[in-house]
């Protein structure tokens, strides 16, 4: 049984070797927690989304991201505005300083990815990217319930 879990171990190991040094550096250099940086990164991908949107796409709990957003707004890294169509919704945008931090940090993330993928050929990188996208999309579309249900049925 343990031998069959090598893919999960590999994913976890690579994620740890990628996340730990990068988010540790982000915290030491900018004083931002991982959820706070995830908010900045998410807004770099698409501005005008809600904290709930980021929670759904990132997998972080809503209350964790709510605290992160509040701290980022207070630090003026993120701007929160009321949605014109839905007064209950708050749209999020990068502040000037938040955008600057994102632009300063992204090269390190890219360099780490390049280092991790260096042993792979271009074809292997493309294959890995397609497979990871397929897994991520399935989790995104099925949500946590689908991931938990499929794991429970295989035991």
How should each PLM-predicted stretch be described?
Residues 1, 122-155:
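C-terminal regulatory/oligomerization modules of transcriptional regulators
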Residues 1-30, 42, 77, 155:
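N-terminal leader segment of winged-helix/HTH proteins
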Residues 15, 41-45, 106, 133:
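Short, locally clustered residues in the helix-turn-helix/winged-helix DNA-binding domain
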Residues 28, 56, 73-74:
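Alpha-helical residues within the helix-turn-helix
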Residues 36-40:
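Short alpha-helical "packing" element that flanks the helix-turn-helix/winged-helix DNA-binding module
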Residues 46-50:
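Short capping segments at the starts of secondary-structure elements
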Residues 51-52, 63, 70, 90:
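Residues within helix-turn-helix
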Residues 70-133, 137:
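Charged, amphipathic alpha-helical coiled-coil/dimerization segments
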């Amino acid at each position: 049984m343990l031998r069959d879990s090598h893919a999960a171990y590999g994913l976890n190991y690579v994620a740890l070797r990628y996340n730990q040094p990068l988010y540790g550096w982000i915290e030491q250099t900018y004083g931002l927690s991982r959820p706070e940086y995830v908010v900045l990164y998410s807004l770099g991908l698409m501005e005008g989304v809600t904290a709930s949107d980021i929670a759904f796409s990132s997998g972080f709990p809503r209350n964790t991201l709510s605290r992160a957003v509040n701290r980022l707004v207070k630090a003026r890294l993120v701007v929160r505005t009321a949605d014109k169509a839905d007064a209950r919704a708050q749209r999020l945008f990068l502040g000037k300083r938040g955008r600057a931090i994102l632009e300063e940090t992204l090269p390190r993330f890219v360099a780490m990815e390049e280092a991790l993928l260096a042993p792979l050929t271009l074809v292997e990188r493309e294959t890995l990217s397609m497979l990871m996208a397929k897994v991520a999309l399935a989790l995104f579309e099925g949500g946590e319930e689908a991931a938990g249900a499929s794991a429970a049925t295989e035991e």
